[in-house]
Regions:
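A domain-level signal for caspase-like cysteine endopeptidase catalytic cores
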Residues: 1-80, 86-97, 108
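Structured alpha-helical
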Residues: 103
Length: 108
């Protein structure tokens, strides 16, 4: 299959083992996603471990540039969420509307 673009499966993980979290995003990436490109060369996989809102912004900026280059992205976020929003590694919270606005450009 000769494609001019790539499919990208990207995991953003913001979990903290000090709080008893299992690094499920890490396990998913290492045990499943990293194997995909050998079978499907048109698929690339990436993993971002983010510890703060600033790191989340940096990761989504990189992902936005991937989308701007024409690749198709599937984004998977491993973090805890609640009524207020998503809790990051450092216990900061990004509200649902803030998260929506942050990742919306990736989906347009």
């Amino acid at each position: 299959m000769d494609l001019t673009f790539k499919y990208r499966i990207i995991i953003i993980e913001s979990l903290n083992t000090d709080n008893g979290d299992s690094l499920t995003g890490t396990h998913l990436f290492q045990n499943i996603l990293q194997r995909l490109p050998s079978k499907f060369p048109y698929i690339e996989t990436s993993f971002y471990a983010v510890h703060s809102l600033g790191e989340l912004h940096k990761a989504t900026d990189k992902i936005k540039s991937i989308v701007d280059n024409g690749d198709i992205v599937i984004l998977h976020i491993e973090a805890h969420g609640g009524e207020e929003g998503v809790t990051l590694y450092d216990d900061s919270i990004i509200s649902w509307i803030e998260l929506y606005n942050l990742i919306r450009p990736i989906n347009i």
